[in-house]
Curated annotation (Swiss-Prot):
PANTHER family: GENERAL TRANSCRIPTION FACTOR IIE SUBUNIT 1, TRANSCRIPTION INITIATION FACTOR IIE, ALPHA SUBUNIT. Residues 354-364, 379-388 have a biased composition (Acidic residues). Zn(2+) binds at C129, C132, C154, C157. This is General transcription factor IIE subunit 1. It is found in: Nucleus. One of its GO terms (biological process) is transcription initiation at RNA polymerase II promoter.
Length: 438
């Protein structure tokens, strides 16, 4: 059962007290903001903006001043919208118990300040030296009086002192406290009337409530927007009924018509002439090393050779190069031993293997073409021979050919080499080492 002395409604005296104080000591903006909080227990900041038509920065400045003076309190609540987005809102309300205590404190502070000013004005110095600016009170007049001249002189510089007009008590200094009590009497009466008022907790800490005026205006706006939407068709949106929702801001409808794009692309291609294919795409660069006469002498049909080359150029571009290398490697073992032995000193003397390889390839070009045409079906065997030659190169020892692996296993063969053969052997080992790590 509730206590009969606890009030569940704010007394009219407390409301009048709040109005008197806010209108007597604050501006019109503060008075308007507090009037809304007097009529409505707890108001959201957005609703106050809607009612007062203030700028948000201006309203917050006013509310912060009132909150700093303990006239109002603020409560922040996190709310979840229909779309799942959480927002924070500030709710303001008046705690009347704190309001009464603040008013009592400020009035008492003002009364003490007036009494202090009145007391200081009666005890201030009344004489001042124009030279050294020393001040003296009425109680020091016996020290200032000079009986020889009958004047008041400064005790420091012996200059005649003057009355300090700025230190003279004001005419209304003694009546200021009386005037203050007379003007603040209505507030004192309201404070005495609300001295023993005990308010319930739901009045001191109210819950947020909806303002009827705003609710009616929103309902009317929603009804008008719905009627306008029906009159204008379904394509018109009722903006007032849609809250701060962001789900429709990024909705985009994109339609892609591929037929139109293909027609435009085809038309653009028809207007442009086809670019000429480069020579390395139209024909093999290796084929240029052979001429038609050499191919005829070797018994090769030029047309069939070209058809064969064109048929193999697409699937594998490296096939022609590999075939030429295989033919070259096959030709090397069939060469006379004398020619091979003569080639080694020349290679060592020139210090370059690329020149000897180039000369051999130039000398063997016609037989190579014939071999290509005659041995299309023996490529596997040639691959095996190429691997054997590549894996085990030939080294000359005293004019006789030996495999590189055999010379490496028998050091006595190295001792039988001539200086030129030894240099060729060392160079071949270096090349094999470099090829191994490339």
């Amino acid at each position: 059962m509730a206590d009969p002395d606890v009030l569940t409604e704010v007394p009219a005296a407390l409301k009048r007290l709040a109005k008197y104080v806010i209108r007597g000591f604050y501006g019109i903006e503060h008075a308007l903001a507090l009037d809304i909080l007097i009529r409505n227990p707890c108001v959201k900041e957005e609703d106050m903006l809607e009612l007062l038509k203030f700028d948000r920065k201006q309203l917050r400045s006013v509310l912060n001043n009132l909150k700093g003076d303990k006239f109002i309190k603020c409560r922040m609540r996190v709310e979840t919208a229909a779309d799942g987005k959480t927002t924070r809102h500030n709710y303001y309300f008046i705690n009347y118990r704190t309001l009464v205590n603040v008013v009592k404190y400020k009035l008492d502070h003002m009364r003490r300040r007036i009494e202090t000013d009145e007391r200081d004005s009666t005890n201030r110095a009344s004489f001042k030296c124009p030279v050294c600016s020393s001040t003296f009170t009425d109680l020091e007049a016996n020290q200032l009086f000079d009986p020889m001249t009958g004047t008041f002189r400064c005790t420091f510089c012996q200059t005649e002192v003057e009355e300090d007009e700025s230190a003279m008590p004001k005419k209304d200094a003694r009546t200021l406290l009386a005037r203050f009590n007379e003007q603040i009497e209505p507030i004192y009466a309201l404070l005495r009337e609300t001295e023993d008022v005990n308010l319930a907790y739901e009045i001191l800490e109210p819950e947020p409530t909806e303002i009827p005026a705003l609710k009616q205006s929103k309902d009317r706006a929603a009804t008008a927007a719905g009627a306008a939407g029906l009159a204008g068709g379904h394509h018109r949106e009722a903006w007032t009924t849609k809250g701060p929702s962001y789900e429709d801001l990024y909705t985009q409808n994109v339609v892609i018509n591929m037929d139109d794009q293909e027609d435009l692309h085809r038309a653009s291609l028809e207007g442009k002439s086809a670019k000429e294919r480069p020579i390395w795409l139209r024909e093999s660069t290796v084929q240029g090393a052979y001429n038609s006469e050499e191919m005829k002498e070797g018994g090769i049909d030029i047309d069939s050779f070209q058809e064969h080359e064109e048929g193999h150029a697409g699937p594998d571009d490296n096939e022609e190069v590999m075939r030429a290398l295989l033919i070259h490697e096959k030709k090397t073992p069939s060469a006379p031993a004398g020619s091979v032995g003569a080639a080694a000193p020349v290679t060592a003397a020139n210090g370059s293997d690329s020149e000897s390889e180039t000369s051999e390839s130039d000398d063997d070009s016609p037989p190579r073409v014939a071999t290509v045409a005659a041995h299309h079906g023996e490529e596997d065997e040639e691959d095996d021979e190429f691997e054997e030659v590549a894996d085990d190169p030939v080294v000359m020892v005293a004019g006789r050919p030996f495999s590189y692996s055999e010379v490496s296993q028998k050091p006595e063969l190295v001792a039988q080499m001539t200086p030129e053969e030894k240099e060729a052997y060392i160079a071949m080992g270096q090349r094999m080492f470099e090829d191994l790590f490339e």
